[in-house]
């Protein structure tokens, strides 16, 4: 399960690309979007069709790029807001396991809603999870909610597999150029920090949008690995808008390689 203590940290993007990485590695993989109040899978995978129902009134997952996909957004049309009480949310959560024909899978990645609500409670009572990954950004508010999520998984005896830090930094690359000025003695500073310049005056700089090291410190506190640090990436954002995971559209991209390493770490845990 891929979880987060709060919304807006990129949990669904992480879950989608992790599932894509496992699929590309040759595993039979499913992705279940359990965020009933705000399903995103129809948009992030560019899917408009509804899932089919077989003769036994069981739902057939939508298949795209060898991924078996299911989301409440496929059923609701992803249009009207969902205003449901806890028991109805719990019932729908169970149906995604009982009434969906997943078939044989190596991995079923669950994209949980943020927080510690009805879906998480239902899973802990009804569905045995092999483990949970918590997604966070490196700022204090998100990290505080990580602790709440970790405590919840601990109480329901679900192993915590690790932490993924999203939006860790922004990679800034450039080159100083001038047609009429000698740049041999020029120095570059960003936020009062001197930036190293190559001989050709090019540079690479990691700009931390939030504080540095938040995810690492939290993973150490929880005694679990920091599985990956995902930089802020325009390519990653655009891939979501296009409805195609970056891991599928450009598996050589530096961010895709991070997702591949996270998938590899999961494979090693479940050999």
Question: Which sequence ranges carry the predicted segments?
Answer:
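Short, hydrophobic alpha-helical segments
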Residues: 263-271
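Conserved catalytic-core segment of NTP-binding enzymes
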Residues: 106-107, 113-224, 229, 238
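Residue-level signature of catalytic and energy-coupling elements of molecular machines
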Residues: 7, 33, 41, 70, ...
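Phosphate-binding loop that captures ATP/GTP phosphates
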Residues: 28-84, 90, 97, 216
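Short glycine/serine/threonine-rich phosphate/pyrophosphate-binding segments
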Residues: 9-17, 39-42, 112-120, 142-145
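Phosphate-binding/switch loop-helix module in NTP-utilizing enzymes
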Residues: 73-123
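C-terminal boundary of histidine-terminating zinc-finger modules
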Residues: 242-255
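Walker A/P-loop phosphate-binding motif and the immediately C-terminal alpha-helix
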Residues: 1-33
